[in-house]
Amino acid sequence: MRFTLTKEFIDVIRQKYVEQDTSWFHENVLELHYADIAEILDQLTNDEAKFIYFLVDEDTQADILMELDEDVRDRFLASLTTKEIADQLENLDSDDAADILGELTDEQIHEVISQMEDDEAAEDIVDLLNYDENTAGGLMQKEFIQANMNWTVDRAIVELRRQAEDVEKVYNIYVVDELNKLIGLLSLKRLLFASPKTQISEIFQSKNIISVKTSDPDEEVAKIMEKYDLVAIPVVDFQNKLVGRITLDDVVNLIKEEADKDFQLASGISERIELNASVWRISRARLPWLLIGMVGGIFSAQVISQYENGITLVPSLAFFIPLITATGGNVGVQSSAIVVQSLAKGNDQIGSIMQKLLKEGLVGLMNGALLSVLIYGIAFIFASSTLGFVVSISLFVVVVFAAIIGTLIPLILHKNNIDPALATGPFITTLNDVIGLFIYFTVGMLLYQI
């Protein structure tokens, strides 16, 4: 039965914490899935969360720790001694442990590592900390199953049992040569059905082996795993020696983080912000784009001021300013959002780019024509035929230009290695406001012969 967290249940937990009723927690909380326990701890104070956390067995503690909200986890770890942190890291996969250590100061890292009892685990974590966090090396884990090509099946099974003690999930066996270079894969099924004296070299798969290098960007890793539908991918160094693997759950977390970042950029927030971030940090993240919007507003005001005489002679021109700016901004954001989504999937070839530009241009022409006819009728009924022509022609041109600009800007940013998600936010809206107003008043002045 699926667990649903309620306020009433949290209230009971808090009461039982006050009473220190450990038997109740064992019966009603510790039996839950670790993801549900993590959801509960996210809602509690640090002391309440620690009380429940240390009632759980060590293996489940590791799962809960990685399921906690990032800010809650950081606050929780900050309340632990370096020895307690070291004990927790020994229960985690090396990549997760390295991620947690990476948030600490150099002095804290040294203290935690020095207090870890498992020297091999400590060495693996230190090794991972040497890689850039945005590369395959920073994403990989050191726990994996490997077999030498010269082993027999029965020896491989014995070795794999020993290796599997530290590996949470086994997807494939990586086959290496005497120099530890990756040469192929072996499925568990094929290993188990092979004769005990058969050599691994006779049964492993050596063709079409997909791997990544430690220096490959993490986004490239995600694209490769998506393309080949992989649940895990081996990681090799520049000599093709096997050094780790990346699993699907790591990539899913990466994709989620990138999606969150792009959404915040599109919303005009310049850095990643958590729900419980400080007021100063939230203000700092939002202010740059608000300033850009303000500057854009000043430019728009300047454009309007240049046509002050025309507005004085034809005041009804001012009525449709919001329509022009809002429509241009919406069209630009729609076009840029489609292009950004396409670029995120790796579609950045020249042919594909020209196709996008042509398609968005045609969409702009079609939508512009339909909207122009509609607005002409409305303006004609409530104002005059001349104003109807001004608004409809302007709207048509603005929609087409906005569609093209919304397509081009993400492509230009991507070409210059700038995150194209920037183009889906206030930047594109502000730019289209200025251009749209210029087009609108220029058409108005021409048709009214001012």
Please report, for each region that a protein language model flagged, where it lies by residue.
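Hydrophobic packing positions in regular secondary-structure scaffolds
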Residues: 1-266
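Short leucine-rich amphipathic alpha-helices used at interfaces
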Residues: 8, 14, 19-20, 26-27, ...
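Alpha-helical transmembrane segments and their membrane-interface boundaries
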Residues: 258-396, 400-404, 408-422, 426-430, ...
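Extended alpha-helical regions
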Residues: 155-158, 435-443
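Ser/Thr-centric signal marking residues that sit
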Residues: 247, 429-432
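Cytosolic juxtamembrane regulatory segments of multi-pass membrane proteins
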Residues: 212, 431-438
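Mid-bilayer segments of alpha-helical transmembrane spans in multi-pass integral membrane proteins
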Residues: 108, 112, 124, 399-400, ...
